[in-house]
Design a protein with these regions (language model features):
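Active-site beta->alpha loop and helix N-cap motifs at the rims of alpha/beta catalytic domains
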Residues: 2-143
Length: 143
């Protein structure tokens, strides 16, 4: 008998199997290109209230820039989004699939995945952009 913890909780697994829309979260910035926490929360609430099945954070349009040490927004953006999604779940009793983008070579990707797990994310969407010159074997080992 397999004693490992299931990869996804049963409600999240069932929800995902039913088929849901999970939009990628754009980064909300002020006109002076500073992180706009108020508008970021509003954007998250818009997606959730519109019926999305979850939100993917730190992917696509925000994937690389928020990780830049000079910008330093990766943890802040993931944390804010997780907090807003958990509040929505508590308020509506409707599960959301929380997806975190994970990038970089294995050490960075593992660190990002561990942070996402600590914040309550369900799934990591792994970018293989760091392996553009790598072999398939290197990418498979990374995953």
């Amino acid at each position: 008998m397999n004693s490992q913890k299931p990869f996804l909780s049963e409600p999240i697994h069932r929800f995902l199997d039913d088929g849901v829309v999970i939009p990628a979260l754009p980064l909300a910035l002020t006109s002076s290109r500073q992180f706009d926490e108020t508008r970021q929360r509003a954007l998250l609430r818009y997606y959730m209230d519109a019926g999305s099945g979850g939100v993917a954070v730190g992917v696509h349009s925000t994937q690389f820039e928020i990780r830049d040490p000079e910008i330093g927004l990766f943890e802040s953006v993931l944390s804010l989004a997780a907090e807003e999604m958990k509040a929505y779940e508590a308020r509506t009793n409707r599960p959301l699939i929380k997806v975190a983008g994970v990038v970089g070579k294995s050490a960075q990707a593992v660190k990002e995945a561990e942070l996402a797990a600590e914040l309550g994310y369900d799934i990591a969407l792994v970018s293989l952009s760091a392996f553009k010159d790598g072999t398939n074997d290197h990418m498979i080992e990374h995953l």
